[in-house]
Amino acid sequence: MEKIPNDRTVYVYCYSGQTASQTVFLLHLAGKQAINVSGGFDKGISGEEAAKELMTTEAAAFGEETYTVDADIQTAVENYYKAVAAEKDYAKNNISPKQLKELMDAGSEDICIVDLRSEEDYAAGHIEGAINLPYGKGMEENFDILPTDKTLILQCYSGQTASQTTAALRVKGYRAYNLSGGMGAEGGSGWLGAGYTLVK
């Protein structure tokens, strides 16, 4: 963490943008200027013709300079990733649409689905039983409506903003997971891509 610059923008990517989004939140927590690359490598970077000219198989190295990180935040970030590594049920804090549907079909009362999309999109159709907590500035003021005795399944449009929120809630002690692919689209990924229905 101390090798990541504080004085310039850091762009973070993974395969889809979802685990990178968790990392972006943690970097923000540490005071770093981090931005998630939307769509990650698979659906973002690799599709850009100009990016292909910049790709290499050689690993980049960190510079020699180090940057101060608050000790408590450093510990929180280390504990976060230890928990990710120890997670047995849902890898990298992601739950698949199929896994969520199985929990719903089993009548699980131990989960709370949280839809982070806009009020308008939520009203137009949402996963059955989901509550609406639109993603955006000030949303943390409403975290107290979220149950602390249930597993939170967070869902947005693509899984990226839900991943950032997953990280924020886990740091605060919630058991939270991102719905992989988010709401998605028919014929694509996410809840709709898996062929599951919505309610109004």
Where are these regions (language model features)?
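Short, surface-exposed ligand- or partner-binding patches at beta-edge/loop junctions that are enriched
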Residues: V12-C14, Q155-C156
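Conserved alpha-helical interface elements of two-component signaling phosphotransfer modules
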Residues: E120
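Short hydrophobic beta-strand that contains or immediately precedes a catalytic carboxylate
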Residues: L100, C112-R117, L133
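A short acidic-Thr-Gly-centered motif at the start of a beta-strand
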Residues: K101-E109
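Rhodanese-like catalytic fold shared by cysteine-dependent sulfurtransferases
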Residues: M1-T9, Q18-N94, K98, A123-T151, ...
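Active-site proximal loops enriched in glycine and acidic residues that flank catalytic Cys/His/Asp
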Residues: D115, C156, S180
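Single, functionally critical "micro-switch" positions that shape active/binding sites
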Residues: S16, V114, S158
